[in-house]
UniProtKB/Swiss-Prot annotation:
Segments annotated as RLWRNWE repeats: 34-40, 61-67, 86-92, 107-113, 134-140
Name of the molecule in the record: U-scoloptoxin(08)-Er5b
Subcellular location: Secreted
Signal sequence region: 1-22
MF terms in GO: toxin activity
Protein family membership: Belongs to the scoloptoxin-08 family.
Annotated disulfide bonds: none
Domain of life: Eukaryota
Repeat found in the keyword field: yes
Species whose genome carries this gene: Ethmostigmus rubripes (Giant centipede)
Amino acid sequence: MKTNCEFPLLCLLIVLVANVEGEVEDTGLKMVKRLWRNWEDPEQRQLLDQETELEKQREKRLWRNWEDLELRQLLNEFAENQREKRLWRNWERRQVANEDDGEKAKELWRNWEDLKRRQVADLNDEQETQRDKRLWRNWEDNHATLRKRSADSLSRQKRLGKERGKE
């Protein structure tokens, strides 16, 4: 009886049951023993643990980047609201002081609107710059992770190939 099994405990159970029934070939038993050794291999376990830890660190880093971005946006909104209030109070004071001078009030209003538009444009530019930086960092992190995984996979394949060659 030959079997190809991904789960070592299940393979062991199949071999034990088949052995009781007298149907086990030596090659099947060797295959199950080899699978079991690979499963218990500390190097293999360590590689899996390292990959898991790298993935956790990457998720934490992405989460911190997102939280930092959210905080910056909230602070920018707060600062923008404070500037608006200050500009509005200034405009009201000037409006009261210059009630008789309608042209000056209109000019102040236009200046205030222009300032508001420039502030919104500057804020949008800053947010876009921050977004581009964050996307670039994420791309670099992902690229580095993929290179590391590829190198780990190649070294693992070479090592497994050598082990299989010895058997």
